[in-house]
Amino acid sequence: MAALSCYPPEWDDDERMSFLFSAFKQTRDVNTSDWDGKMKFWIPLILKHARAQGLLSISLSQLERDFRRKGFAPLGLRIVIQEMMRQGTLRKESDYVSNVSSGWLSWGMRQLVIRPLRWTIGTVLGSQMGPDEPLVIPEIIKERAALVLQRYQSSPLRALPLLSEEEVRTLCAEICPNPSALNLVLLQLQGDKKICVLERAGKKLVKFVRVSVGQVDPISESDLGIYELQQSEKLLSERLQSAGEESDRLTEEARTYNRAGNKHQALRCLRKRKLLERRITELQNKQDTVQGILERIAAAETDRKVVSAYQMGVSALKLALKDVTMEKAESIVDQIQEYCDLQDDLSQTLASVSDADIDSEDLEKELNDILQNKEMIVDLPDVPSGPVVISPQRPTEWETDQDIDSEDLEKELNDILQKEEMIVDLPDVPSGPVVISPQRPTEWKTDQASRSPADGSFSRSVPEPVLQ
């Protein structure tokens, strides 16, 4: 299995591979699980192998060589291929070409692509499938055709109206490594209406579809004329480059002959260079003329696209303004103004509702009630700022100014003043430690106590608090 790109997980399991390499039963009805198990293994593996190897067509003999393991080839590949052909996964190359070429293809495609493909089939094999008969894989061919189209649209060659066969092969060299694969891809693109193929003066010319266009247009005389001009410009550029190199060579030879003292040969070289310079000038003028024509063609193509865009814009604008006239617009504006005026009149009418049915006496009565309620609210006592003291001997009552006795107030005020004096006469908080005598209960020393001989500080004693 040297040609196989990757081994499946079961490839190293001899017992499993012995089963998969064995021949199929005569019919699927004999053993359904046996038949389906082999098909689920071989069909995906064949397609994966073809994609990895870049194969657009395969044959029975090729698969038997590629899947050979330990000197043995799978015995059921013919049945697998027949099942793939029944599903449409594989098709005979001859049937594929005939089916694709039966519709829109031009005579040029039949001559340039189909005939070489049919020639590669070889001798007639009859109704039986030969071991070397090519079998194409339509799914992979479509994938390669999409890649070729993408490659063209992203390359500088997209600016050219037509491509030669050599340019197409160079463009698709990595995608289609051999002529047979390229012919299959071109056939698929032709069937999808993505390219046109034409032979002119023994040269095969291919026209690709433009970007953002669904189908390719047929090759026109304008395309052929632009192609000829571009080929002429290319030829003139090559001749100019060759003439410039020849002029440099003659100049160098003239210097060499002059140093060698051969003045006659030096003058001869200069004479040839002068004639060559005239030729270079003529070639340059021709190239400028061709380039000017190509530039005008490009400008005309741009103008054509601009005019086409203008025309599409006018058509869109015309469609947008369909059934819209000046009279209709003025009528609509008048209707809008009329309905706006009507709305203003309605709003003004609704805002001027009469209040004659409202009784003035009822309003005055309601006003007097409001004023009386306000006076009652003003006569209420102030809200107490402190907590309400509730006496346990009698229910809680709100006191008024008439219930308060002046003598009681004076007595309460004297009590407050006496309490303040008592607070003022309290001794200061001792700043040092409290000295406790062991012979008597602890006492706070008063202000009249003598100075302590130990530290010279005064201590004050107060009566010891009594717990009640």
Curated annotation (Swiss-Prot):
GO terms for cellular component: ESCRT III complex; nuclear envelope. Residues 233-303, 353-379 form a coiled coil. Keywords: Coiled coil, Cytoplasm, Nucleus, Protein transport, Transport. Belongs to the SNF7 family. Residues 428-468 are annotated as: Disordered. It comes from the Eukaryota. It comes from Xenopus tropicalis. The lineage of its organism: Eukaryota, Metazoa, Chordata, Craniata, Vertebrata. One of its GO terms (biological process) is exit from mitosis. It is found in: Cytoplasm; Nucleus envelope. Its main location: cytoplasm. It holds the Pfam family Snf7. ESCRT-III-like protein required to recruit the ESCRT-III complex to the nuclear envelope during late anaphase. Together with SPAST, the ESCRT-III complex promotes nuclear envelope sealing and mitotic spindle disassembly during late anaphase. Plays a role in the endosomal sorting pathway. This is Charged multivesicular body protein 7. The keyword Coiled coil applies. InterPro entries: Snf7_fam. The keyword Repeat does not apply.
